[in-house]
Curated annotation (Swiss-Prot):
Keywords of this entry: Amino-acid biosynthesis, Aminotransferase, Arginine biosynthesis, Cytoplasm, Pyridoxal phosphate, Transferase
Known partners and oligomeric status: Homodimer.
Gene (name only): argD
Catalysed reaction equations from the record: N(2)-acetyl-L-ornithine + 2-oxoglutarate = N-acetyl-L-glutamate 5-semialdehyde + L-glutamate
SUPFAM superfamilies named in the record: PLP-dependent transferases
N6-(pyridoxal phosphate)lysine found at: 234
Protein name in UniProt: Acetylornithine aminotransferase
Binding site for N(2)-acetyl-L-ornithine: 123, 262
Domain of life of the source: Bacteria
Keyword Lyase tagged: no
Cofactor note: Binds 1 pyridoxal phosphate per subunit.
One Pfam family of this chain: Aminotran_3
Amino acid sequence: MSYLFNNYKRDNIEFVDANQNELIDKDNNVYLDFSSGIGVTNLGFNMEIYQAVYNQLNLIWHSPNLYLSSIQEEVAQKLIGQRDYLAFFCNSGTEANEAAIKLARKATGKSEIIAFKKSFHGRTYGAMSATGQKKITDQFGPVVPGFKFAIFNDFNSFKSLTSNNTAAVIIEIIQGESGVLPADPLFMKQLNEYCKQKDILIIVDEVQTGIGRTGKLYAHEHYQLSPDIITLAKGLGNGLPIGAMLGKKNLGHAFGYGSHGTTFGGNRLSLAAANQTLSIINDADLLNDVQSKGQFLIENLRKSLVNKRNVIEVRGVGLMVGIEVTNDPSQVVREAKRMGLIILTAGKNVIRLLPPLTITKKQLEKGIEILTEII
């Protein structure tokens, strides 16, 4: 008997321990992790982060946002660098997107936001309403009004939906949940230029793509894009719950006293994890290594799977990789688990790989070998 709602399709396995890039179940079986807890433990189970959280645990766990927090300032500075942003901390990606939606509407005085079909931005009401998947929004009654949905990578589709009441566009640089679908560079260039011309805010959802996942701190850096608002979570706390919304300083007037808030946002334990995570990831050598390992993974998967009739395409950026297949990918996930490899699905027919950024070449080779055997 379970005391939990049945809203997750749980596998009959429980992980009780971990060692860097490996997971250990209650029967002491060891698994190579190509999921990072769905893009969360980007640095694996890292002892430096453990020590940072432990040190904070010995000081103060929580204090309300009615008082100063030097660790919030420190993490914000690491996220912002030389960019002209301000930061708001929350607990998750969906909360970061809720904050972005509120900021965009209040700052512009406009209500319409353009999102994209097949997108995913979260499951709370505002973020769910911005999600372009009916399976996410069905059966929950009326969604938040004001959202329109364009075809991803189709500039004319986007442009046709804009109006004088368009506050913002919200976009994932790579549509992760729908199949690891990267944005087209020309499309992003056209969208960026048009939005700047029309004073439409650009919200980039970096919840899954941010914090080094693609070999840049932020995936939008691959496109020379300067978003008005950035949302973050997942890898930011390397396993501890935290989200963040970064907004351009010229939007700061819209979030004055009492305009938005959260009880647990900026929690000191989560910030301690984020602080150490960013200290490690904000390193050019590490990020270059992610790009190199991502290229190695994609190229070798393409070579190994070239004669597999059920493989349509291998695609991705950095260590965010999708293998599109003709059959049900959940079969591959089950077989991979049996052989000691933890992987994910995305969309209807994509195997999603999100290994830790600290994955070794030898571990990548092992994963490729297993996938080649079972696909």
